[in-house]
Amino acid sequence: MTAEFDEEVVFENSPLFQYLQDLGQTDFEICPLSKEEEHLAGNGHGEQDVHTTEKKSNISRTVEFLKSWSPLFSKKKRDEKICLLENGFRLESLRTILQQEVLIQEDVELIELLDPGILSAGQTQNQQNGHLPTLWSIATPNIWEMSVLFAFLSALAALQSWSISSSLVWGPSLILFAAFTVLRALHTWRSATLRMILRKYCNQVEGTVLNSRAFTNLVRKALRLIQETEVISRGFTLLLDRVSAACPYGKAGQHASQHLLGLRKAVYRTVRTNFRISRLATLYMLKHYPLNSEIDNVTNYICVVPLKDLGLGLCEEHVSEEEAHNLTDAFSLPALKVLFQLWIGQSSEFFRRLALLLSPENAAQGHLASPEQLPHLIWSDVVQDLPHTQAACLAELKRSYEFYRYFETQHQSGFERTAKRKKEVGELSNLHGAVRSLQLHLKALLNEVIILEDELEKLSSCKEMQAMTQEASLMLEEKLRIIQPHVQASNTCWEEALCQVGRMVRRPAAKKDIEKSSCENLNFPVVSNMPPALRIEDRDPVPEEQILEAYVEEAVTDQEFNSEDIYLFSPEERERQKREREESKRVLQELKAVLGLKASEAERQKWKQLLFSEHAVITPFLPEEPVGHFEPPDSVYPEDPCKNLGFYGEFTSEINGTEHAKDTPNQGDLQMNMNHEDEAKICPLSEEAEPESGKDENESPCPVPRTVLPPAIKERLARIHQTSDLNFTSGLAAQVAARSLTFTFLQEQTFGDEWDDDDDDNDNDDDNYDQVKNVESHEKERNNVSLQLEE
């Protein structure tokens, strides 16, 4: 060692050396002991110290053995039993706190840094170390007590007789044994009573922890219900088959903070009360049960932050409903979420400080220093009314949550069920919810299918993979499993929407006469029963962007309500309904802005033309039954049933090719119009009905078909066929395709053996001329019959 002091020199096995080794620092010079010191340590001084230590150890062992057998030191034994009970309470409380996961991750890391023994003590599963000792283990006598009992019994057995002279022997022995027995019974009773008290406090700790966790989960569910209601009111839904019924269709125009107002108030009151009482308990622990400066650092606690800085009405003990309404922006969802986050942090902070206070290390430092330091007394002094307050808040919030979640949404009163208008609003709500759910499930399904298609393209483009691997098969199976719930949910929503529409259609038909209902049925489109196309070829162009739109048409007027129902409402009610409809329009406009821009009619028509390519039109899907065999409903044209039946019978027979062209009156007019090359190539049947109506004004005109061939479809067909003139067969086939609303099922039909040879144009012209003549004669006969019937 050098004569001068060197700061970088550290003696080996010194406290500073051990400290630097624990910190992981090794960049210092180690100075070993000198040879003289080592020599002195190996001489007689060292041997003398060894002998002295051995003598002291033997003497101490003998003294400890005598103390253990001596009744004078029984107080220490009693204290050990009490310490065993207290230690069991500490460990069981720590295990309850750690197992119920009431601590956030930051507090767990802080406990691991400040007192790692808490985590190991809380995970103890041994009954002797992790639980309270049983009554049998407390009342079990030790060796000294058993020896006293054996000595007393031996003295009694040694006596020859129970005489007065022998009373000098057994009398004091009996008195001493009775006193010993009474003291032992009192000690056992005291230990059993203490164990019962500790068990009660252990149950209280467990109940407080469970109530805190249950309250946190219930507040989270309530906030989710509030958020779901707000989301649904704006036109969205969660990943469920049906949207929640907490926001009916009639409430769509309300403000966001007006939904579930009672539940919002209950959440604010209960969370605020629990936050304040947990904060007071934590401050009480910091003030009356201080630990070291590292644990009680103010930067680790939320409770030291002034309540005025937190806001939300937490600084005042009592807050009125109006003040709370103003401080939380009408109990808005962001304010409730901030308050919930404060509660989570404060609750975790309280249990963290309690765990540090009940740690076994603190028990070893201040073991039985005073009766107030016992852990169950500390717990009782700290919590005070906290368990009762938390239980009351949990019950209040649970009652409010169950009311809004179950009673209001599923158990409606009989008056609401019998009210006519509310029933209609409920049906509209169900239909609206089903359509919204269907739209969003289809959107989610489209996204998943796009992802699956990308994965398949990646697998097909990989040249190294000659066969599909096991990982790829599992990946595809997982993707299909993700898609399946959306498909099932879409089917459920579609079926429910159809059922709702069917019920709404059948209800007015039962109340009104047949003529009026048949006129109203003109607005409903004819749904074709033909199966859809299974595949779309790869070369068919598809739109680059497919926007799924789900919205209500803007042309919503007061005519959507029946005139018979107007007298049921007061002027105030009608004004309120008008405001609600205007608010609904505004919300729908916002929803359309969120979902995407509404495509114009021209863009939609362009997408339809691109979607159905030339290959899809020319190569139809061949069903098992002929496409032409469909019958339109009889209630579509109720004015003249005879004419309508004749019209449809002739029209369908012409499609099926079962009758000759001369039996159809409208085909002649159609062929005459088709011969004009300067006119449009295809004339709809609605234009052909005008000359016939001009012949006889008394005769009711033929009603206009509901499906009219648009100009875009004419251009599409003209571009497909690429011919200068369209004959009667192609025109009639186009009419059939327009009425069926499906271009992929277009089948070419023949209407007689004379048209089989398409190459001979002259034969076709002659046949068409004969057909026109036959049609004119048939039309004249028909008009004469109708005049005779009218007379």
Curated annotation (Swiss-Prot):
One of the record's GO molecular function terms: myosin binding
Keywords, in A-Z order: Cell junction, Cell membrane, Coiled coil, Membrane, Nucleus, Transmembrane, Transmembrane helix
UniProt xrefs under InterPro entries: Myosin-bd (IPR026859), Vezatin (IPR026858)
Comp. bias intervals (Acidic residues): 752-769
Recorded superkingdom: Eukaryota
Coiled-coil segments: 435-464
Family: Belongs to the vezatin family.
Subunit (UniProt): Interacts with myosin VIIa and the cadherin-catenins complex.
Protein name: Vezatin
Organism: Xenopus tropicalis (Western clawed frog)
Gene name linked to the record: vezt
